[in-house]
Amino acid sequence: MTATDPVANLQTLIRCPSVTPAEGGALTALDAMLTPLGFTVDRVTAREEGTAAIENLYARLGRDGPHLMFAGHTDVVPVGDEAAWTHPPFAAEISNGELFGRGAVDMKGGIACFVAAVARHIEKSGPPAGSISFLVTGDEEGPAINGTIKLLQWAAERGERWDACLVGEPTNPDRLGDMIKIGRRGSLSGKITVHGVQGHAAYPHLADNPVRGLLQLTQALMDPPFDGGTDDFQPSNLEVTTVDVGNPATNVIPAKASASFNIRFNDSWTVETLRAEILRRLEAAAGNGQLRPGRPPAKYDIVWADRPSHVFLTRNNALIASLSSAIESVAGRSPALSTTGGTSDARFIKDYCPVVEFGLVGQTMHMVDERVAVADLETLTAIYQTFIDRWFAHAGS
């Protein structure tokens, strides 16, 4: 086996059961692919009290600029009901032109293809006129506390600087070449608790039902809309994700009621301005007597979740143009430049250099029978190799 073969690379990685937070041998396998290519490889274990220690990998080829980073993760989500899989989730079996296994598209496949692309570039042209690095974590599918964010800090403290980054997440909804992610919405979560007075459901005047107040508050968060979208982002959207009263009895008015929410927001907002708007809405709704006639304003508190994600947009023309033209040349289609979807580790990388995301088709990620077309692995490798050639030609000019 040589690192130029993306299929063999991916089979090796899938056969490592690296369900977060387990390394599972995946970083060891990646190390074994990169070291013979001339990369200097560091294994970095990150820790934080109350969380699982996570092993990460940073590898660099070359010492000069320009410097291109590829970022990704070898950790995967649990397999679910293994008996429901057509092929064992860590066997990496090929059937009818598809390679099955947990992580096939999210995102061991992207890593396997970029390794193959770099190996082919070296085989054809020698090392690049600059530097290529791999920044790979084992904590993307988990809490993301001991992963990319700490690996970036570790590398930056040692003098590492990057000119651009490609994240190999599965960005394509239907076909390879559909979409490049050039930014991501921000994400902010919180929990509202309304405090009432417990009592008998038949005597509501002797109690104060917090559910009524909670309904007022959550309604105010969902309507009216926060905005109508911007040129680069879809409208901000808030979803109530949990509702709880902790009350199993149908004839008891509960003492408190809580609801959690998450909002994905565009570049009309910052975390600070969005929090202020949410607090304004809650304060106004607390005094709304529609559901609580004759009652004083609802008593409530709000707790914000740690580590909100900030919205970002990449406008680096050289990075986007090099990748777009590579996709058009190899796949024959012009990719959409999108900011849709959830968050990724690009939210951390954007603080260090321009970053975009492009990988495989994501239709089966996290599903039973996660799989990738073998032909797509070859196509993605060719796209990545062409991108490497064009980015260094542009960045070095």
UniProtKB/Swiss-Prot annotation:
Belongs to the peptidase M20A family. DapE subfamily. This is Succinyl-diaminopimelate desuccinylase. Homodimer. The active site is at D75, E140 (proton acceptor). GO terms for molecular function: acetylornithine deacetylase activity; cobalt ion binding; succinyl-diaminopimelate desuccinylase activity; zinc ion binding. GO terms for biological process: diaminopimelate biosynthetic process; L-arginine biosynthetic process; lysine biosynthetic process via diaminopimelate. Zn(2+) 2 binds at D106, E141, H366. Its EC number is 3.5.1.18. SUPFAM superfamilies: Bacterial exopeptidase dimerisation domain (SSF55031), Zn-dependent exopeptidases (SSF53187). Binds 2 Zn(2+) or Co(2+) ions per subunit. The keyword Zinc applies. Pfam families: M20_dimer, Peptidase_M20. Catalyzes the hydrolysis of N-succinyl-L,L-diaminopimelic acid (SDAP), forming succinate and LL-2,6-diaminopimelate (DAP), an intermediate involved in the bacterial biosynthesis of lysine and meso-diaminopimelic acid, an essential component of bacterial cell walls. Pathway: Amino-acid biosynthesis; L-lysine biosynthesis via DAP pathway; LL-2,6-diaminopimelate from (S)-tetrahydrodipicolinate (succinylase route): step 3/3. The gene is dapE. Its cofactor is Zn(2+); Co(2+). Zn(2+) 1 binds at H73, D106, E169. Keywords: Amino-acid biosynthesis, Cobalt, Diaminopimelate biosynthesis, Hydrolase, Lysine biosynthesis, Metal-binding, Zinc. It comes from Rhizobium etli (strain ATCC 51251 / DSM 11541 / JCM 21823 / NBRC 15573 / CFN 42). It catalyses: N-succinyl-(2S,6S)-2,6-diaminopimelate + H2O = (2S,6S)-2,6-diaminopimelate + succinate. It is an enzyme of class 3 (hydrolase).
